Structure formats: C-alpha cells, structure tokens
Amino acid sequence: MPQTPSTRWCPTPEQLMILEEMYRSGVRTPNAAEIQQITAHLAYYGRIEGKNVFYWFQNHKARERQRLRRRLCARHQQQPSPPSSTVPPAPTAAAAGAVVQVHPAVMQLHHHHHHHHPYAAAAAAQSHHLQQQQQQQAEWPAAVDYCSTASASASATAADMAIPPCCRPLKTLELFPTKSTSGGLKEDCCSSSKSSSCSTSTN
C-alpha cells in the first residue's frame, strides 16, 4: 500500500534559525506582505507556505506568553506582594499608518538576497518608525504583571484568594447554556434602568 506524503510542515534547521533570528530582532506579527517575503526567502531552504510562517509566529508568541506567565506565577509565589504595574495603551490603527509597513528585519533579510526589490525604498523610509513601534510592542508584554492585574471579586472565598489569579484553573463558559439565568438576558437588561447600552432598537 503506497504511503501518501505528509502535508505537515517540517522546518529545516536553516528555516528555524532564520525565523528565530527575526523573532529576536522584533518581528512579532508580520503583515501579509512580510509573510510573502519571508516565505519566498525561506523557500530556498525547503518546502514552506505562507500559512506555515503565519502560524510559526502565532505559536512562538503564545509560547513566550506561557513562559512569561509561568515565571510571573513563580515569582508571585515567592514574594506575596508583587509591585503593581500599569499597562500602556495598545497602538491604534491610525498610529500604525495607512501605508503597508515592512519590518526592518524582514527588509534586511530580503535586501540581503534581492538587491532590487520594489518595496525597498518605501520600507527604508519607514523603518525607523516601525522599529520604534515594534520595540514598544515587544516591551509591553514584559511590563504586564499577569499575577497582579486580575483583581479578586468580593464574593471570592479565602481558598480562592490563596491562589494567585494567573495560577487558578480557567473557567469554561458554556456556549449554549442549558439553564436559564434569572429570566434571560433580555429581560434582565430591559427591566433595569433604561440605559442606552440596553436599548434594542433597530436601525
């Protein structure tokens, strides 16, 4: 019986090395143009698709957040009162600019092998702004203390208070609840004071 070839992506060591180097240089969420450029470059080292690049960055960010959360939980358990921190506001779409921006690390990677790329002039002009923006975004997750940002509710028991919020098991919300919640959401909303957030008017 002939075996069908696996469709799963198996990155080569060169592909992994390049992706990790780009991640360390600040590329966290490449846009579509960057993903195309990265994919084209990595194709020299083996089979790869754009979705592989996209998912690699998503997974790498998720693993980094998990590691950070574990470290913060361990630190929280060692010292009972961690310093509180403020979370900076997320950048808006207007701050990012309307022009498609290419991360300097992607341009450096691309420029290294392809000297006459049409995006090179536009990306070089915007690289300084984008580099600052990526650097800020890279610093934000480290500034967030996941163990101290979640506050316990007044109805929390003493046992719940002993476990830091980041270390408690996650609660799964039912997508389609089988029990009615005190008469239903619409009744609760509209029986309370008539506020603009509860209005059910149609446009």
UniProtKB/Swiss-Prot annotation:
Residues 80-91 have a biased composition (Pro residues). InterPro entries: HD (IPR001356), Homeodomain-like_sf (IPR009057), WUSCHEL-like (IPR044555). Keywords: Developmental protein, DNA-binding, Homeobox, Nucleus, Transcription, Transcription regulation. Residues 109-118 have a biased composition (Basic residues). One of its GO terms (biological process) is plant organ development. One of its GO terms (cellular component) is nucleus. Residues 73-95, 109-135, 180-203 are annotated as: Disordered. CDD domains: homeodomain (cd00086). Residues 119-135, 190-203 have a biased composition (Low complexity). Disulfide bonds: none annotated. The keyword DNA-binding applies. Residues 4-68 bind DNA. Expressed in leaf primordia, young leaves, floret meristems, floral organ primordia (except carpel primordium), stamens and carpels. Does not show polar expression pattern. GO terms for molecular function: DNA binding; DNA-binding transcription factor activity. The keyword Transcription regulation applies. Transcription factor which may be involved in developmental processes. Seems to act as repressor of YAB5. Belongs to the WUS homeobox family. This is WUSCHEL-related homeobox 3. It comes from Oryza sativa subsp. japonica. The gene is WOX3.
